[in-house]
């Protein structure tokens, strides 16, 4: 797992009490084209967007390897980004949610649907 920003700066948040930036690799790409050049092998781009073409999250089958793209709360994902996505998903409702909340809902859905196998030496 890793997190990334495109055309933006990562700001440490006082609400991030676990210091996520120190535990998960953070990549910053200057633009969307740079991100596209650095997508890991066999990864699917999933746009999270209120769009008529998008599938509802509760019906969505997550691919094994995915990059979830979330746009700005006020403008969403640009059309040229949505066109590059392999799939689009949306949450129910008519209003945009906070990006952090949306990301948490999508990742919770993924964790609930996609089995994770830990190595034999892993201790819980």
Model feature map: region roles:
Residues 1-50, 111-112:
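RNA substrate-binding interface of SAM-dependent RNA methyltransferases
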Residues 12-19, 58-60, 101-102:
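Short secondary-structure transition/capping segments
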Residues 25-27, 49, 67-71, 90-93, ...:
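Short, surface-exposed linear patches
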Residues 32-36, 53-55, 96-98:
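A short acidic, often aromatic-flanked loop/helix-cap motif at beta-alpha or helix-coil junctions
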Residues 45, 69, 102:
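Conserved RecA-like P-loop NTPase ATPase core
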Residues 51-91:
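Active-site/ligand-binding-proximal alpha/beta "capping" segment
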Residues 79-123:
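Structured adenosyl-cofactor binding patch, chiefly the S-adenosyl-L-methionine
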């Amino acid at each position: 797992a890793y997190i990334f920003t495109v055309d933006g700066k990562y700001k440490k948040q006082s609400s991030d009490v676990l210091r996520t930036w120190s535990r998960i690799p953070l990549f910053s790409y200057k633009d969307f084209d740079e991100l596209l050049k650095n997508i890991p092998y066999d990864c699917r781009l999933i746009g999270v967007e209120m769009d008529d073409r998008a599938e509802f999250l509760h019906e969505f089958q997550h691919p094994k390897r995915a990059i979830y793209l979330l746009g700005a709360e006020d403008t969403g994902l640009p059309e040229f980004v949505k066109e590059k996505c392999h799939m689009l998903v949306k949450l129910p409702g008519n209003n945009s949610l906070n990006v952090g909340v949306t990301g948490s809902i999508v990742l919770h859905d993924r964790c609930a649907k996609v089995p994770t196998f830990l190595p034999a030496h892993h201790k819980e």
